[in-house]
Design a protein with these regions (language model features):
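N-terminal beta1-alpha1 cap of cysteine-dependent amidohydrolase-like domains
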Residues: 1-96, 100, 205, 212-230
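Beta-strand-turn-beta hairpins that frame and shape the catalytic cleft
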Residues: 18-21, 146-152, 190-195
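Glycine-rich beta-alpha junction loops
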Residues: 27-29, 159-161, 201-203
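Structural motif
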Residues: 72-76, 109, 196-198
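Cysteine-nucleophile active-site neighborhood
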Residues: 79-146
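Glycine-rich nucleotide phosphate-binding loop and flanking beta-alpha elements
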Residues: 80-81, 115-117, 161-163, 203-205
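Pocket-forming structural segment of enzyme catalytic cores
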Residues: 120-188
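A glycine-centered loop/beta-turn motif at secondary-structure junctions
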Residues: 181-220
């Protein structure tokens, strides 16, 4: 029997010398409820397939702030109590680090309760309010100028309603399901290389284009050749 979240596929490509990518997983002990750890493993494998040596580290409550920016940061979904603990810890200094890292071009992927915690701490322009929404399968189209984008798919487990300071910062528009709040048709948030979604699944398993985009953004930040500007 496979271990949880074991990857099934071809062997990764050999890593190019000096081509190391550093990934920081935020509060993994508090965000393990919905299988979002799979996003970490999928991104790691995608980067390895592109010839990268991937170093994955973890940051928990009370840990020392990183001395330098990572190439990517990931945070999964969290229950309300864990979300509060995370938000309080973020306010102690990690929120400022993340905001500066994103401004410097680092990639961030936040899911559901982790996204809400980042909003609570002021890292991303999103707020979560109490709600009564039910679990649902969801589909959304990526927002792109002048046309329809790729399909974003997953399932939603949040009762809260998520609101963006500016709906134009949504990652996608809903095709089915309720997205951020069931009212304005938005799903997730995107600010530069920071992506947030309410979808589990894990999201990167069901939406390969998003997995590839994150990897592209990471390599573009590092100045690697062979990545077209989007």
């Amino acid at each position: 029997m496979l271990e949880p979240w074991a990857y099934v596929g071809s062997e990764p490509a050999a890593s190019a010398p000096g081509k190391q990518v550093r990934v920081l997983v935020l509060y993994p002990q508090l965000t393990a409820n919905y299988g979002d750890r799979g996003n970490v493993l999928l991104l790691q494998r995608e980067l390895e397939d592109r010839g990268c040596d991937v170093c994955v580290e973890e940051h928990g409550l009370g840990d020392v702030l990183p001395a330098a920016f990572y190439d990517a940061y990931l945070i999964g979904g969290a229950m309300p109590h864990e979300r509060e603990l995370i938000a309080n810890d973020l306010r102690a200094g990690m929120a400022q680090h993340l905001a500066q890292a994103v401004d410097a071009g680092s990639v961030l992927l936040a899911v559901a309760g982790g996204l809400a915690a980042l909003g609570d701490a002021g890292v991303l322009p999103v707020r979560a309010e109490p709600g009564d929404m039910e679990p649902a399968h969801a589909y959304a189209k990526l927002l792109v100028p002048g046309g329809e984008g790729e399909l974003l798919a997953g399932y939603q487990m949040h009762a809260e309603r998520y609101y963006l300071d500016n709906p134009r910062n949504a990652l996608a528009c809903m095709s089915a399901g309720y997205g951020n709040n069931g009212e304005d048709g938005t799903e997730g948030v995107r600010i530069n290389n920071a992506y947030g979604t309410t979808l589990h699944g894990p999201a990167l398993m069901r939406s390969r284009w998003l997995l590839e985009r994150l990897a592209d953004d990471i390599l573009r930040r590092r100045g690697e050749s062979g990545v077209d500007d989007a």
